[in-house]
Amino acid sequence: MSKVNTDENNFINNNNSNNNINNNDNNDNNNNNIQNVSNQIENGLLSNLPTISSSCESFSSKSHSLTERRSSIKNLLDNFSTLLDILEIPQLMDTCIKNNSFDEALQLESFAKKIYKQYSNNTVIIEIIKEIKVCTRSLISTLQQQLRQDITLTNCIKTIGYLRRLSIYKENELKIIFLHSRDQWLINSLKFDITNSNHVTYLTKLTDSCRTNIFDIVTQYNAIFSNESNDEDQLDDLILYNWIQQKIKVYINIVDSTLNHIKSGSSISYVLENSMYFSMSISRVGIDFRNLLEPIFEKHILNNFLSQITTANHHFLETLKTYKFPLQKSTSPTSSTTSTSSSSSSSSSSQYISPPLSILQHQPLAVLVNLILKSFNELKDCFPISLRSIVILKLKELIISIVGGVTSFYNQLLSNTISNLINSPSTTTTTTTTTITSSFDKVFHSFCKCLAEDFIPFIVKCFDIICSQQLQQQQQINDGSSSSSSSNSIGIDVDSLVLSLKKIYSTETQTIPSTQNNNLPPIPDLVLRGNKNSSPSTTTTPTTPTPTPTPTPTPTPTTPTTPTITHSTPPSPLPSSTTTQLNSNNNNNDNNNNNNNNNNNNNNNNNNNNNNNNNNNNNNNNNNNNNNNNNNNNNNNNNNTDKKVDERKEENIIKEEEQPISTSTANKNDIAIETITTPSSFSSSSSTNTKSDEEIIDKIVQPDPVVVEKQENEITNILKDDNETTTDILTDNNEATTEIQNNDQSLNPDPIIQEIEDTPSEVIVNNNNNNNDDDDTTF
């Protein structure tokens, strides 16, 4: 055990010794290496020392910049919330605008401007300011959009205040922006509130909307811009009134164009009332345009009235052309007069008058009175006093046109009847024609009498009541008292207007019977040639008298006379042709004298030219007549002949003339042909020494045996020139018809003439009127 230990120790010692030897060797090697390294380091340091110095300096500078960056980052972290708020200003401002938080948006805009003044070179601040400008434009657009909506006065003031705080616009520019925005709202409100409807509803809604909205806009404008300084130009006040003038002009144009489609008087009155209320409402802010509305409504009211009465007149005249007058039954004139007077008295006692019942007997007059009363009712609702004189003038023209149309119709009818009598050789046809015409005269005279005494006075009275009511209302408005107006205060002289009609139905023909030869038909011997400026003339008709002789006056040798002379006064003051009236009754000469006395001056004025013109024609046919006093007789001899009268009829006529004539009695079938001459009141002619109407009427010429021979020669000459005279009659009738049409363009009597020419041959009339009162024969 010990040996082992000894061996181990020896081994250990040997190892230690060996280790020591090795360590010594290693130490020597290390020392050598260290020496070598130190030498190398020393040599390297000495050679690389400048490089090391520069590197240190570089490191030092880098470390300094890093230190500064570190400090700035640390400062940024410390102020992160503030910087975040600045960066979020544009986004926050946009959010405020969208939420209508205009105060906060304006505060952010003001804060951004302050930052920009301090850090105008900062890139971040510049970018923020660019975004702020975009948001500001959005803010202005939003504020203007609010002004284009239905906004209250408070919000208007706030909105304009926001625009003022932006300091972008001047005061005048703000006014223009305000009015432009509110005008857009007004246009849109009118566009959407007023839908397609009838014209009255459209104007009513338009007027109400304009009245409310324009008044609000003007009130808002005055409230917002009332505190401005007076150093501004006075033209600033014109901004508002120019805008108002434009709006009123547009409104008036719309009213003017829309009223063309409104024909009801009550509707026009309703629109007028709303328009006047509109003007009166905005007059509280200094705007009153009622004077601009008056001519517009007056124009449309007058046009509607004229259109209605023109249509009524045209319808009446056209109806008159084709209307067949029923032959009148024998009625008591007293009862008709009583009914008319009672109706008129009852109507006068009532506030609302009714048409006379006599108008119902004539369909054209009944239709005409309905149309005219309709136009009066339309006019009554909206009748301005300023149109009174114009409407009176138009009403007078209407009455003249109606009277002229009826007179022209009558004249053409009788002219056509004369042509039929001349051209018809048949005794039966001539007798039938004259009998029908005689029956027709009674009906037509009743028609003219109703027109003159009932229809026209009733129309004038109705219009007088309308004028009186308007004048009373105007008087009450002016001084609070009502004034009563006298009857027919409108100044229309009814008597002068219906004078021509009265001459038609009040003319009484004087019939002088001829011989007892009843085998011959009543042939018109002499017919006056028509002249539109001729004086009252006479025609002759051989009739069948009673055998009672009467003394005859002795005429002068130079004056040829005719067997029968009848005369009547001119039926119309209007220009027309010479016509002939057929009458089967013996008329009273006194009434005829009265009618002639009324127009004596007019007849004398036109007598000279007629006599002079006809004298030349008479010289060609009758060499024995040279005096101007015989012109009427010569004219009659030239114009009324029968083309187909043979020698037998001529001899019978001469025999009839030799018989004594009685003016006291006449047979039932005697027919007197009466010439009614209508002188022209519009043509001026010099008056000469001619016989007055009274002298012609009072003188009923009787045939004289001395004159018979002259008449034979005259009749012979007349028969030779019958073709020429007949042509002259037709030519004169055409000239008269042309002149009538020029005076009344709406009247064309040609269809009437053609219808009447064809009618008499088809109508059978019993001459015994007393036994056939129930016949309902029409002409």
Curated annotation (Swiss-Prot):
Residues 641-658 have a biased composition (Basic and acidic residues). The keyword Protein transport applies. Its main location: Golgi. Keywords: Golgi apparatus, Membrane, Protein transport, Transport. Residues 544-560 have a biased composition (Pro residues). It comes from the Eukaryota. One of its GO terms (biological process) is intra-Golgi vesicle-mediated transport. It is a peripheral membrane protein. It is found in: Golgi apparatus membrane. Residues 8-36, 330-349, 533-543, 561-640, 675-690 have a biased composition (Low complexity). InterPro entries: COG8, Cullin_repeat-like_dom_sf. The keyword Ligase does not apply. Residues 1-36, 328-349, 512-691 are annotated as: Disordered. One of its GO terms (cellular component) is Golgi membrane. Component of the conserved oligomeric Golgi complex which is composed of eight different subunits and is required for normal Golgi morphology and localization. Required for normal Golgi function. Belongs to the COG8 family. This is Conserved oligomeric Golgi complex subunit 8. It comes from Dictyostelium discoideum (Social amoeba).
